[in-house]
A protein has these predicted regions:
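Bacterial Sec-dependent N-terminal signal peptides
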Residues: 1-39
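N-terminal amphipathic/hydrophobic interface segments
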Residues: 31-451
Length: 451
């Protein structure tokens, strides 16, 4: 009885031990078989099948004793893709092919590749094409002398110079890659994109074939007629001629320059600038700084806000105008001559060497160098102060020429003792200046004086 119980006890322990060992072995096998998340293994491809060859033989004593030597209308099939050539070495053991002469590779209805010679690895699903390589994918054509096509990742790489043609867009680079599934390309070193008459040069460019949109990285330039765009981080849409520029970019159009932290540039249309925007017109000799600007290159009209400052240096003395908002309108007198009107509002501040002014709103006309101020304007000239409902100031090359005060005009002149003031008030007042000083004054309507 005791022996029987002892045997049952031992047998129970054996069963438990076997179960533990089985469970441990199962866990160990699972751990060994668990795939690595960071590595994507290439599957073993199906066999490469020889469909046809006019001649087939072996050369056991030659350079390729393991190869079937094929000649004449050679044709292979591998996982739905076809490879044809004039002659080939077929390595059946390694599932690979070396093809020569009029090599033509076809994959489905959208991709074909031609070259002078190629190596195809069925295990790695890799095609290495050399000499006069032409890859056609949908409406795109890639030309190069050295190209590797990875079927598993749908990636074509060239590394000895290549050209991608996409409709009117033509991209040239020393090195590049093209993804046939996403239809995105990357080009590096001496990159040049031609789109119609526009030319983009850069060292690194990402190109989205579906959107015809290029992303330039590093020092880049877009030349479009007389316009030149410089950027180090920009997106360019070849269909719409629109560019999004970041990282302190510049647009140059003949004598005009637009610079900003962020620019949205539209060829022959309205462009927008954000952050430290600087606009310079060298021909008209004026400039504008602000933190937000809309400017139409075709019409010459613009809108500026966020601390705008307009600077006119067309005369010997420079005029500075500051306000919350500014509007710029350009007018063409004839083909070669233009003038501008600057509307500034509110909280206007203006400064020249011989004149300072404040008002609620101001209009400056570059044609007659007239500055018209509205709503509580005040003008200072030396020791004289002019006030009124509206003030017009006309300027010469370097000084004030004429001032016209309309409505509740008041002139205050500080005397040499800095204590007393001469004052004249009237409905209208005209002041004529010479060398920055009042030479003659006229007060019209309800004149009152205090001396």
């Amino acid at each position: 009885m005791i022996n029987k119980r002892l045997n049952n006890h031992i047998r129970g322990h054996r069963i438990i031990s076997v179960m533990v060992l089985c469970l441990f072995g199962f866990c160990l096998m699972q751990a060994m078989q668990a795939p690595k998340k960071h590595a994507r293994k290439r599957p073993h491809g199906d066999r490469v099948y020889l469909l046809h060859a006019d001649e087939l033989y072996y050369d056991m004593f030659g350079n390729n004793p393991d190869a079937q030597i094929l000649k004449g209308k050679v044709s292979f099939l591998h996982q739905g893709s076809h490879l044809t050539c004039d002659s080939a070495y077929f390595y059946q053991a390694s599932n690979s092919v070396k093809a020569f002469g009029h090599v033509h590779y076809r994959q489905g209805d959208t991709l074909s590749l031609t070259c002078d010679r190629a190596e195809y690895d069925g295990q790695m699903q890799m095609m290495r094409a050399r000499k006069n390589v032409v890859l056609h994918h949908r409406r795109q054509t890639l030309r190069t002398d050295s190209l590797d096509f990875d079927r598993l990742y749908n990636m074509a790489n060239f590394f000895d110079g290549g050209t991608l043609i996409d409709g009117k867009d033509k991209l040239v680079a020393d090195w590049g890659e093209y993804h046939t599934e996403t239809r995105e390309a990357k080009f590096v070193y001496n990159v040049k994109l031609r789109s119609g008459k526009d030319v983009v040069t850069t060292d690194t460019l990402y190109y989205d074939v579906r959107k015809s949109k290029a992303h330039m990285v590093g020092p880049s330039k877009i030349v479009s007629g007389a316009s030149v765009v410089k950027t180090e981080d920009g997106y360019y849409d070849t269909k719409t001629d629109r560019a999004q520029l970041y990282g302190r970019s510049t647009v140059i159009d003949k004598d005009k320059t637009l610079t900003g932290d962020t620019l949205y540039y539209v060829k022959d249309g309205e462009s927008t600038g954000y952050g430290n925007v600087v606009y310079v017109d060298k021909k008209s000799k004026n400039s504008l700084t602000c933190n937000y600007l809309r400017y139409n290159e075709k019409t010459g009209n613009g809108f500026a806000t966020r601390n705008p400052v307009a600077i006119d240096y067309s005369q010997k003395d420079t005029l500075w105008v500051h306000s919350d908002t500014m509007r710029i309108n350009t007018f063409h007198i004839n083909t070669d001559s233009v003038y501008r009107k600057v509307h500034a509002y509110p909280k206007v501040r203006a400064y020249r060497l011989d004149m300072q002014a404040i008002c609620d709103s101001l209009v400056f006309n570059s044609q007659d160098s007239c500055m018209t101020m509205y709503k509580d304007p005040i003008v200072w000239n030396g020791n004289r102060q002019l006030l009124g409902e509206k003030i017009l100031v006309f300027m010469n090359d370097s000084t004030i020429r004429f001032a016209h005060v309309i409505g509740q005009a008041l002139s205050v002149e500080q005397m040499p003792d800095s204590v007393h003031f001469n004052q004249i008030s009237s409905s209208e007042m005209k002041s004529y200046f010479e060398k920055g000083e009042i030479k003659q004054g006229e007060s019209i309507g309800n004149v009152q004086t205090i001396y």
